[in-house]
UniProtKB/Swiss-Prot annotation:
Chain spans, region Disordered: 33-77, 108-184, 212-234
Modifications after synthesis and translation: O-glycosylated.
Signal peptide: 1-28
Cysteine disulfide partners in this protein: 281-308, 393-433, 419-448, 567-609, 594-624, 745-787, 773-800, 806-848, 834-865, 873-915, 901-930
Record gene name: SEZ6L
Extracellular compartment residues: 29-958
Record-given protein name: Seizure 6-like protein
The UniProt record lists the keyword Transmembrane: yes
Residue ranges, compositional bias (Polar residues): 138-162
Compartments in which it is found: Endoplasmic reticulum membrane
Signal found in the keyword field: yes
A Pfam family recorded for this sequence: CUB
Amino acid sequence: MPAARPPAAGLRGISLFLALLLGSPAAALERDALPEGDASPLGPYLLPSGAPERGSPGKEHPEERVVTAPPSSSQSAEVLGELVLDGTAPSAHHDIPALSPLLPEEARPKHALPPKKKLPSLKQVNSARKQLRPKATSAATVQRAGSQPASQGLDLLSSSTEKPGPPGDPDPIVASEEASEVPLWLDRKESAVPTTPAPLQISPFTSQPYVAHTLPQRPEPGEPGPDMAQEAPQEDTSPMALMDKGENELTGSASEESQETTTSTIITTTVITTEQAPALCSVSFSNPEGYIDSSDYPLLPLNNFLECTYNVTVYTGYGVELQVKSVNLSDGELLSIRGVDGPTLTVLANQTLLVEGQVIRSPTNTISVYFRTFQDDGLGTFQLHYQAFMLSCNFPRRPDSGDVTVMDLHSGGVAHFHCHLGYELQGAKMLTCINASKPHWSSQEPICSAPCGGAVHNATIGRVLSPSYPENTNGSQFCIWTIEAPEGQKLHLHFERLLLHDKDRMTVHSGQTNKSALLYDSLQTESVPFEGLLSEGNTIRIEFTSDQARAASTFNIRFEAFEKGHCYEPYIQNGNFTTSDPTYNIGTIVEFTCDPGHSLEQGPAIIECINVRDPYWNDTEPLCRAMCGGELSAVAGVVLSPNWPEPYVEGEDCIWKIHVGEEKRIFLDIQFLNLSNSDILTIYDGDEVMPHILGQYLGNSGPQKLYSSTPDLTIQFHSDPAGLIFGKGQGFIMNYIEVSRNDSCSDLPEIQNGWKTTSHTELVRGARITYQCDPGYDIVGSDTLTCQWDLSWSSDPPFCEKIMYCTDPGEVDHSTRLISDPVLLVGTTIQYTCNPGFVLEGSSLLTCYSRETGTPIWTSRLPHCVSEESLACDNPGLPENGYQILYKRLYLPGESLTFMCYEGFELMGEVTIRCILGQPSHWNGPLPVCKVNQDSFEHALEVAEAAAETSLEGGNMALAIFIPVLIISLLLGGAYIYITRCRYYSNLRLPLMYSHPYSQITVETEFDNPIYETGETREYEVSI
């Protein structure tokens, strides 16, 4: 039975409550904000339990009921008010179908109606109105309800503060999880002024939620919410929960329902805002040249930041050179240029060092540019130009006490190593530069070590050095060197250095055994024989004994063989000499000079060969040593640490004063600096030690470049007296040169086989000089040099190297190739072979050859492989009265076809024709013709005539036989006819010769079987 109708006062209260709820100003504002014609339905909410939707099983959601409000909240309120006043609210005890929206057909929300749904009657509406008792519902339940299909009905409990989303709005939580998949170049205007509540965003950077007065969008029907499995919160502040709290009061008694009250509801909702994940973009380049421009990255989404990575990868063996065309970044933006070496990233430059015109080169074939910005507007801009350049191996490390000769640093180049006199090479004598993403040498650089002992036969010149101590030595050594010169020659030993420990011993014998004459014993004399030792014969034996754990003793003994009656060849370290007689005969004069940075000491600059009977030099060779201090006034010079190349001694205090022209200044280039932490090198700007210091260094340091402001420069070096305790360094090398006094960089020289261009008329700071090479040459080094703030160039000038390789001609379709050298150096050959079914057009062998001008090229163009059918010659056919040998339909170029004629015919034309390659291919001659052979014809005629005569004779004989036979046959036939036709008139009556008196009987046989039925008529004579 339907419930009793409530009093009029209760109805008026409920109508006022619904008018406030459904017709609030907020709802009106949201309704006005919608575009014209927007029929977006209101969000779904729940009906009381016990009212499942018609047509759907009630077991799935027994406590849920989802209806959808029509677009106009005011219209819904008016209609519902009329229903309530009429007392026709729907009942909760009956199946309540969805209310049809009171809108025109074209303005209705685009939701499919469930089948067989009918409009509710006024009685049902009134019954449902009286049973409106919201029940407490958890947030999870609300989300589950949002996942149910919404019907086209009036949402009786729709909140006026909620702005519904259009049909098909995605689940906000799911949308947030898929935020990273949004296109990076999304128009920022789309998110500038949101017309719908912001969806729930979930990202790795989630901040704490705050309370706002906006409801989140409902999820898409059919998609479960992410919080379905979560427990319901302790207190729910949703509109449904606020109404559920008063359910018992609303249903308590009829008297309470009849009271005339006005209810106001405050609805608060919670929106979780999150920090957006970064918008990522990645661009890859593989062209040999191009630009990286800030316009390549997408527009920045609102309230977000952008991360872009630009990767440039070129062919193996080439690097990437970046040149800064323009850079204008905002504060907080990051622009980093990184070298990529496998998994390792090396920062080559960043935004603090990037200036226009700067050049950065990658060490491998890949370079990466990383850009990051947090700006909402005013993004920084940059433009970089990139181009490929040929990578090269690093210059191989020169072995200590050795040298290296490099033929080419590019791929395929070789480096040859050799050791100085007295040292032996340990390792490969030759290394090859291997082509790779980062070119490298084929193996580690070798080292040079001094051996412990050895034998030298047919000696001419050499050294005996203190042996190198390996790491696993036990400290004791006993070394024997035997030096044997050719017969008739003598040996001279020159002690360039001899420092023996107290317990170490050295002996020198003039012979092969230690029983020979003793020339020197370190235990018997304390002086060093700097004048040298001469052998009595052609052999010298040197013995060295040491018990030290490390190489406490050092010595350097030079030996040379010379003819008897001549002086030995002199020698000076760190210097040179000139001689009047290269055979060093009696009267020869030798003059010595020292290398820059060294001075002569311990001997004269000139010596002479004297004594005819036993020639010798009138004095010992001098020594060239790096001095401690001095005054230098040359235009250019060298300053070395004391005792260079040997380590400096402790307790040194040296001062060098350099002076150049009055209108000039000094450029000082510190090329090598290796000091201990207690040793100090100070550079002063001026002619005396004063506070104006250009630089002060200790320990290890890289190359330094300094300029003086005056024509004078002072260098002071102090080594710690306690150097044996704290250790000491190897020393330093400094070059200086006189330069003009101005505010510009020094001019750079021209390069051979190339030219240079200058960006400014004056080489001021920021000016650039660009070098280029002539055709056929590659530039080695940086092609663009920039004048830096300290008036020095960014790098050394490059040089042009002749190109000795060809570019790869490429692959040929349908073929394979065999390359003799993967580097494609001059002389490399490439052999192309076509696959089966294809024929090669062009030369199969290409060779790289060098030209006087221009780059090396290949001997011919790249061939092509074409199918056999496209090049084959068709069969020309058969000549009349002839045939072919080995008949085929198609003939490849180069194949031949042979013709033959039948007997009696003669072939006119080429017996064999050949298929000639062409476009199209053709035969080298026409089809031959088979003509009758005249000799054969006459012979055949004679044979025919002879055959005719023979046949005539045979015919005559046949006639002679045939005529009598014919006559006899005629006679017999006539007799037979006479007997058979004329027997009735004969008087001779013979048995069985007369016909019977009965007529002849004609019998026609019939057979039922059609197979045996012949249809013939047979005659039989019957005698009775």
